């Protein structure tokens, strides 16, 4: 249920008002990230989530709640409460592994997701690329970065091959291997977009694995694999710029050195793939 309030509340207030019988599970963090934590009562478990990006507009967090409200429980956690800076969703039991599942199994999950009704809002990358440029450390902004940004702005985003609801953050840490099959968590970037964009954004280990995933998906979607792979490749420069910009943005936001290393590595990949 959505609960509208302009006044943020504390964690203790949230629990006492809405979940008075639940208590935090302090020793459990499998599959949790950011400010998330687990609460439990008589074997029933919920995940209490906060926005990963404290500077993001509240509307982005609300969209995540709406996306989860639309999705079937077979692929995503069901939400139970939304209010400013807080969301409570089902805990998904299962294993979160350090590597991707079999490509055919993952292709099946993504194809099933892409058959669901659209969310109602489009994923557009250019505004994000420009935001990350503007919000990055001025000392890190380079002529090459600006040149690539202008090039993409002029080229415009590839025309969608098929428009569907997307997760847009598919990696091993966001996949729960449950008894009933694969499920996805962390839907903060979800929206409608090109299915090839989703496939391009999967955090794969190598090109061979990526090609196999695309081939397995193409078989299910009845698309020529070569055609789908060409469309996936069209998105590569956009996604690498998105990743690099996000790492730069997070570096300025947090001061965490890991983001500088990740940004530098992504810039190198972008130069290789040009």
UniProtKB/Swiss-Prot annotation:
Per UniProt, the keywords (alphabetical) are:
ATP-binding, Kinase, Nucleotide-binding, Transferase
Q: Which InterPro entries match?
A: Aminoglycoside_PTrfase, Kinase-like_dom_sf, Thiamine_kinase
The protein's annotated pathway: Cofactor biosynthesis; thiamine diphosphate biosynthesis; thiamine phosphate from thiamine: step 1/1
Q: Report the source organism.
A: Shigella boydii serotype 4 (strain Sb227)
Q: What does the UniProt record say this protein does? A: Catalyzes the ATP-dependent phosphorylation of thiamine to thiamine phosphate. Is involved in thiamine salvage.
The alphabetized list of GO BP terms reads: thiamine diphosphate biosynthetic process; thiamine metabolic process
Q: Which reaction does it catalyse?
A: thiamine + ATP = thiamine phosphate + ADP + H(+)
| Family, as annotated | Belongs to the thiamine kinase family.
Q: What is this protein called?
A: Thiamine kinase
Q: Does the keyword Kinase apply?
A: yes
Q: What is its EC number?
A: 2.7.1.89
The molecular function terms in GO held by this entry are: ATP binding; thiamine kinase activity
């Amino acid at each position: 249920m959505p609960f509208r309030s302009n006044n943020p509340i504390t964690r203790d207030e949230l629990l006492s008002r809405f979940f008075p019988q639940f208590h935090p599970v302090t020793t459990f963090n499998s599959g949790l990230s950011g400010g998330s934590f687990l609460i439990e009562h008589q074997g029933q478990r919920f995940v209490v989530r906060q926005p990963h990006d404290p500077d993001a507009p509240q509307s982005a967090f609300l969209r995540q709640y709406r996306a989860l409200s639309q999705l079937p429980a077979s692929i995503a956690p069901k939400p139970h409460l939304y209010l400013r800076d807080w969301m409570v969703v089902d805990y998904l039991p299962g294993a979160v592994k350090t590597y991707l599942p079999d490509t055919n199994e993952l292709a099946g999950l993504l194809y099933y997701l892409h058959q669901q009704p659209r969310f109602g809002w489009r994923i557009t990358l250019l505004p994000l690329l420009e935001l990350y440029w503007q919000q990055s450390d001025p000392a890190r902004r380079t002529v090459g970065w600006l040149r690539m940004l202008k090039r993409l702005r002029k080229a415009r985003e590839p025309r969608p091959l098929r428009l569907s609801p997307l997760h847009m953050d598919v990696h091993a840490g966001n996949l729960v291997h449950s008894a009933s099959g694969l499920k996805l968590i962390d839907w903060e970037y979800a929206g409608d977009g090109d299915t090839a964009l989703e496939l391009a954004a999967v955090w794969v280990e190598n090109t061979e694995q990526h090609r196999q995933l695309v081939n397995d998906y193409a078989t299910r979607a009845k698309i020529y694999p070569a055609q789908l792979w060409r469309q996936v490749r069209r998105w590569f420069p956009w996604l690498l710029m998105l990743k690099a910009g996000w790492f730069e943005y997070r570096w300025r936001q947090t001061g965490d050195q890991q983001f500088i290393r990740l940004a530098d590595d992504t810039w190198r990949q972008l130069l290789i793939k040009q």
